Amino acid sequence: MYEPGTEQINCNGRLIELPTLEVVRPAPKMPSDANIDWLLHIYFTRREFTRCRRLIERELNRHLNPEYLYFVQGLIDREEGNHIEALRHLQKSAELNPRNIETYKEIGRTLYIMGRFSQALGVFREAEQRSSRQDHEIYHYLGELLYRAATTQSQKDVASQQQDEARTYFELAVQSGRKLESYVRLAELYRKDKQYQKAIEILENCLHLTPENSEVLIEISVLYLKINETQKAHDRLAEVVSIERKCSPKGLLAFGAILQSRNDIDGALSKYSQIANAEPEIAELWNNIGLCFFKKQKFIVAISSLRKSVWLSPLNYNALYNLSLIYIASEQYASAFHTLAAAINLRKDNAECYMLLGLCLRKLDDMENAFVALERASSMATGQQGAGRNPLVVLNFALFCYETGRLALSTEQYNRFMSQAQDLLLPTEYKFQATKLKSLLRISNQGNGILLDSADMGESDLGHNRATELLPDELPLEVNAVVSQN
């Protein structure tokens, strides 16, 4: 019978001694030339840098090929912020094995962190030449460095060429790998070129990688607002709310823009108030708040909000344009003149700014300069094609010419307006003004040329505050004011 805790067993009256089983494994002895790269890799992935350093110091002098030792030493130095030593060790590793592409990539990353972008670009180009396969990391960094170089380039042609090359590399990065940053950067470049549909497609594909990425969903909703797809934008923002229960300021701003575009001013202001409590230093926020109060005919509060927007972002064209509209609506023509001058300095090719400038000068009794401004606006509007054309600019010039006695020129501009507006659906108020001008020109009986019929055309108005109803891409309205951040 066996008794627990004893080393004997009673079997048929006899005591039998139990043998003691004891397995002793001696510690393995590594030969001096054994490869311990695997152990070093384990320590590094565990971030046990002290053990890594001791192991590297012990093995560096007796290792037959210290390439990996120098490589890991460089990575450790970079993690600890010692970039010069990291670069030195990585270069030693590259000298021992010039065919190792990973070493070149780490050298390029180190130079990128150090801010030596031109040198990093050269290293990644060399890595691209040495690589025998498509490497999405190399393509991504090449695109990133070229895009950075394009933003700091003073020569426009060179900057455009670098930006196109950066887009090509980001496209290669997206095709050869699944890196979130590459998708985001490529979409950013498409957005900068106003190719909003392509940017949306890229970000929709990005959602396959991270279906619940709220930042990507918000960016998609903003792009949908760019193309006036407010319902799709709302659906994407609803997904963000269902994921996070709370929207970021950018998402709330887009939510408010959607409500504002649907004339739900109080709902939009409630969204904006949430942003103002958390992050009040957002120029687009105060721009949109100003437009909400403008819709409520509260001019003083609207002007204060838009002036704060301009103060936060002095080069924000939309805020300057909107502020000038409110100044004109409140009959502050001198202030509107100065604000429009600042907006024109930012966009010298915008016909609507020159049109409003001409209206301000007319109200200030400077007829000569008003004629020059309106003439320039008309010539710009005539040269625009497609969705960019604004026949209201031409009609305003025609009305001004009639007012100042230039009947022949007024007739010419009226006919030009008719040819531009014949396939557009314009507000009824504009049609009334155009019909009135046509009647006045016929009564005067001095118009040179035949007046076109206005039976089937859209309309126009000298009313400056109606100019924003024509061009959805250029309007300083709520949606565009939000999504115009570049």
UniProtKB/Swiss-Prot annotation:
Where the TPR repeats fall, as residue ranges, is: 33-66, 67-100, 101-134, 143-179, 180-213, 215-247, 249-282, 283-316, 318-350, 352-384
Does this UniProt record's set of keywords contain Nucleus? Answer: no
> Which chain regions cross the lipid bilayer?
none
Classification via Pfam families = ANAPC3, TPR_19
Predominant location of this chain? cytoplasm
Keyword tags: Cell membrane, Cell projection, Cilium, Cytoplasm, Cytoskeleton, Membrane, Repeat, TPR repeat
Cite the InterPro entries for this sequence: TPR-like_helical_dom_sf, TPR_rpt
**Example GO BP:** cilium assembly
Which GO molecular function terms does the record list? Answer: dynactin binding; protein-macromolecule adaptor activity
Q: Name one GO cellular component term.
A: cytoplasm
| Compartments where found | Cytoplasm, Cytoskeleton, Microtubule organizing center, Centrosome; Cytoplasm, Cytoskeleton; Cell projection, Cilium membrane
- Described purpose of this protein according to its UniProt entry: May be required for microtubule anchoring at the centrosome. Required for ciliogenesis.
The family line of this record is: Belongs to the BBS4 family.
What this protein is called in its record is BBSome complex member BBS4 homolog
